[in-house]
Structure formats: C-alpha cells, structure tokens
Amino acid sequence: MKSPLAQILQNLHTPARQRLLESQFKKVQTQNVSLEKTLKDKERELDRLKNELNNLEAKIQELNGTDILTKLPNRFVFKEHLSESLKRAIRVGYSLSILLIDIDNLNEINLKYGFELGDTVIIEVAKIVKASVREIDLPARWGGEELVVVLHETDAEGASHVAKRILKNINNLDITDLKDNSAIKVSATIAISSCPQHSSDVSHLIEITSQALLSAKEAGGNQVITAKC
C-alpha cells in the first residue's frame, strides 16, 4: 500500500511534481544550513568554555604558587622571591645571579613526537636544574620551554660554572621515544645576569637576561652566555 505522499505525487502532473520536489529539497537544505550553524555555534561555545577552564586553571596555579607540570615554583613566586632577594642583596652587600634556561628544541620535539614526550623533556630538565642548585637557591618554571633560577651569594663567574654543569647534564639526558625507540637529543641555552654587576632592578635584570638568551639562540643555541653590562 502506497503512502499518502506517494499517492499524491503519482497523481500530480510532472511540473507540479517537480515544483513540490524542489520545495521539499529547499526545505531540507534550509534545515541543513540551520543545523550546521547550530553545530558551529556549539563548537564556538565549547572553545570558549575550554579557554575559560584553562584561564581558571592558570589562576589556581598562580595562587598555589606551584607549576603543575614540574612541581617547581611558578613565575609569580619567582618574581616575588627575586624582588625580595635583590633588596636583601643590596642591603647586605652580596652578589646574586639569575639563570634563564630555554630548551632549544622543545617545539620540534612536540611536533615530531607529541606534547606528552615534550612534557617529559620539561620534567626531566626541571629535575636536572633542581638537583644542580643549593637549598638556598630557587629554581622555578618561567613558562613554556623556559626555567629560571635565583642563585644566592653567587656572582656571574660562579653562576657560569653552575650553568655549564646544568647544560652538560641536559645534553646527556637519556630520553627515548617508545614508539620507535629513537633517542631524543635535548639541548638548551642558558643566559646569566647578576646583581649588582648588571643591574639591581628586577625588570631590568630579567630584560637583559632575556636579551642575552635571544642573542645566544640566534647564534645557534646550546650554550651558556652572560649578559653584557
């Protein structure tokens, strides 16, 4: 037994039938466009919620003062610590140095092997940095592929010895991609600045260290560099 719609279509002349089919087709097209728009709106809303969640996690991380990945103090804690330490160094009259450590090939590792392995590299480098400094010093996660260290009672020459030791251990890291058992080569660039040799201001000290780091990376990276006075 034919459906009512099929019966109507059979009884219609060809032009009328064609118009009806076109009308139904346009209606379906309109519905599809509406569904696609709704889907895109939902995707945008999902992206917005993800961004809000990431921002919230960053705020929580900042308030806690600890970097989730490395378990080191975060940038917020580092800057507060550096500010207070500089005041004390100036008042007491001792040297203080900072190291800015950038993992040279982290972006390449992320693209080639995935972000999970990239996170492993960051964690292992953080372990090396922490193991290479004293209890009185402060290693921290600056963000992305960068770590920082406050070295108390240490001038630029002493900081250079620490930095070279850290770099050597980073170069000797034994990390393997489990998918194809290939060895992952890790390198880093480390910049040094000191108070009072280079500056006694937090922002200026960080700025000149960043500039030195950039110069070293442009020269090929995988080296230790001291900021210019």
What are these regions (language model features)?
Residues 61-80, 101-114, 123:
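Conserved nucleotide-binding and Mg2+-coordinating catalytic segments in signaling enzymes
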Residues 59, 64, 84-97, 101, ...:
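Nucleotide second-messenger and two-component phosphorelay signaling modules
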Residues 1-12:
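Non-catalytic regulatory/interaction regions at protein termini and inter-domain linkers
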